[in-house]
Design a protein with these regions (language model features):
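Structural recognition of the beta-strand scaffold that forms the well-ordered cores
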Residues: 55-66, 102-107, 145-150, 155-158, ...
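Catalytic His-Asp segment of secreted/periplasmic serine-dependent ester chemistry enzymes
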Residues: 208-309
Length: 309
């Protein structure tokens, strides 16, 4: 996977047309490897045997490319040995422990989980070029032994943008709750599709941190932060964390205090920097290699960084 400095990456994705064109070409490369597979309601669990081969597909948005870090990786290419995002740091750590790792990084900037969130975001002025279900799930490596999924951050931003544009009318809380349910339906489609394509893959999911507690929202109105909190906490507690009952391992970003340390974020206040991605990679590595990884917390202080309405 080819690596780019932060400045070069920003130049490539400076305009929507160039962003779409660059990644459309990458998607065509991925499409040349068609995927078929069987069905599996749940996936395997437990760590890979020491020294074994790990075939890893990372499903995500710009976070999977390491956007905000010092070395950002362009998706779909073969190798990114110096990348400083959580995917790349975790891969190097696995290799240092003797694992042989093959990676397909599906991370696409601006991506949301499904077409419904993509359309909603575009309706309210957000640039969203991709979604996980249509543009990432079909290209999961069928021989994957590990799939990681990190969805929700961009989706929360779609919800708050829609509310800011008048969506929800006199019932904004009802609108948020409806979007949480839609996110859950999309997650079911995404996870089912991944397991159909890659039935031997262990699935590790990173839950959604409370976006209201991230630096990029510090200057926003209380109402907007309350909406972001309701959406993020709902996505995590109602959609992502229950996936543990379907055999997924959950990395609990929501309740990890490191998710809210300002020094772990890049200048945009939303994407982690090298330090932030390093902590994410350390938790991902522990989830991959541990025979017993803790379940996500059902409640914690970070779920209420602002008072609920």
């Amino acid at each position: 996977m080819r690596c780019l400095s932060q400045g070069i990456f920003q130049e490539i994705f400076r305009t929507p047309i160039r962003r779409i064109g660059a990644f459309a070409g990458c998607a065509l490369l991925a499409a040349s490897c068609s995927n078929t597979g069987g069905t599996s309601p749940t996936g395997p669990s437990g760590p890979p045997p020491a020294g074994s081969t790990i075939v890893y597909t990372a499903v995500g948005a710009s976070d999977a490319t390491g956007y905000g870090s010092s070395v950002v990786c362009v998706p779909f290419f073969v190798d990114c040995p110096n990348g400083t995002g959580y995917v790349q740091v975790a891969v190097r750590a696995l290799q240092s422990q003797g694992y042989k790792v093959t990676v397909r990084n599906m991370g696409e900037p601006t991506a949301v989980i499904g077409q419904d969130f993509q359309s909603l975001g575009q309706q309210y002025g957000r640039i969203i070029a991709f979604n996980f279900i249509d543009r990432e799930m079909p290209f999961v490596l069928t021989n994957s032994t590990l799939v990681t999924i990190f969805a929700g951050g961009n989706d929360v931003n779609v919800i708050t943008a829609a509310l800011g544009g008048g969506a929800g009318g006199n019932d904004p809380l009802g609108f948020i709750d409806a979007q949480i349910r839609a996110f859950g339906a999309d997650y079911t489609t995404l996870l089912s599709g991944i397991r159909n394509l890659a039935p031997s893959a262990r699935v590790i999911v990173l839950n959604v941190p409370n976006m209201a507690g991230l630096p990029y929202m510090a200057g926003d109105s209380l109402q907007k932060r309350q909406a972001a909190q309701r959406a993020a906490v709902g996505m995590t507690t109602q959609v992502v964390n229950p996936l543990i009952g379907q055999g997924a391992t959950i990395v609990d970003l929501m309740c990890d205090g490191r998710s809210y340390v300002p020094s772990n974020y890049s200048s945009d206040g939303m994407h982690p920097n090298d330090a932030g991605y390093a902590f994410m990679a350390s938790e991902l590595l522990r989830a991959i290699t541990s025979s017993s990884y803790p379940s996500p917390q059902t409640s914690c202080g970070p779920m209420t960084v602002v008072p609920n309405p």
